[in-house]
Amino acid sequence: MKTIRRGFLAAALAVALGGAALAAPPHEKSRIERLIRYIETRKDMKFIRNGSEYTCEEAAKFLRGKLESMGSEILTARQFIEQIASRSSMSGKPYQVRLADGTLIPTAQFLTEELARMEHLPA
């Protein structure tokens, strides 16, 4: 019964604060930043957004800005991929990465695969 009351109080507090109480746990923030750094440090690909190519450094800066503006809604690395790093919120077009050999990969797939790899690394 105490657990139900605590859960209810936490939910009520989050609503009362307009979502301000919601924030990604530190380990999820770390995973999100690792995904962004994974893109940022790649020299062998380009980031494609709304038909234009960007360097990976530019992509990382853009994704951090988008995360900052939507941050309170993003609680996990998977949500980051799905809601921020997958598609344009303006046009709805999916983001892509172009590898050095010309292969295009949806950014959602690219980051989901990297997240899976990260999850299987020793801590």
Identify the residue ranges that each predicted region occupies.
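Compact alpha-helical subdomains of small soluble proteins
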Residues: N50-A123
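Short alpha-helical segments used as structural interaction elements across diverse proteins
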Residues: K2-T3, E28
